[in-house]
């Protein structure tokens, strides 16, 4: 466990000497678990772009601090801004507004339609 602590850290892969250690290049790697994405997975590098992204293909689209209004906590990169915090179609969508925290507000054909849906229902005259 204590062999080459400065070079290896807690690495479990002898093929990636010095690339997995927590104490080597902390600014570049951070806690990366993927040696192919050097410097793209670390928590301390590009916090505004990556945040806590787990998908290297969606650079900067998954971070909690980037585009919070567009992505929210969406788990589906194909539904940008349409999911809010919903991770499954059918749970909370179409109930909070239309999509929750969607970046695109519900579109009404006419202003009167919006007034009718948002107005408090009045008692029918007797």
From Swiss-Prot:
It comes from the Eukaryota. The modification Tryptophan amide is found at residues 8, 20, 29, 41, 50, 62, 71, 83, 99. Residues 1-2, 11-15, 32-36, 53-57, 74-78, 86-93, 102-126 form a propeptide. The keyword Protein biosynthesis does not apply. Its main location: secreted. Residues 107-116 have a biased composition (Basic and acidic residues). Keywords: Amidation, Cleavage on pair of basic residues, Neuropeptide, Repeat, Secreted. Residues 1-126 are annotated as: Disordered. GO terms for biological process: neuropeptide signaling pathway. GO terms for cellular component: extracellular region. It is found in: Secreted. Metamorphosin A may be part of an internal signaling system involved in control of metamorphosis. Belongs to the LWamide neuropeptide family. This is LWamide neuropeptides.
């Amino acid at each position: 466990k204590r062999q080459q602590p400065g070079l290896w850290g807690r690495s479990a892969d002898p093929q990636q000497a010095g690339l997995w250690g927590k104490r080597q290049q902390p600014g570049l790697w951070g806690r990366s678990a993927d040696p192919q994405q050097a410097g793209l997975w670390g928590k301390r590098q590009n916090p505004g772009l990556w945040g806590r992204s787990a998908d290297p293909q969606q650079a900067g689209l998954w971070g909690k601090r980037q585009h919070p209004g567009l992505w929210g906590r969406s788990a589906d990169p194909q539904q940008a801004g349409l999911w809010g915090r919903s991770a499954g179609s059918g749970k909370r969508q179409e109930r909070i507004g239309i999509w929750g925290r969607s970046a695109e507000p519900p579109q009404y054909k006419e202003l009167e339609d919006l007034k009718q849906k948002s107005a408090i229902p009045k008692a029918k005259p007797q």
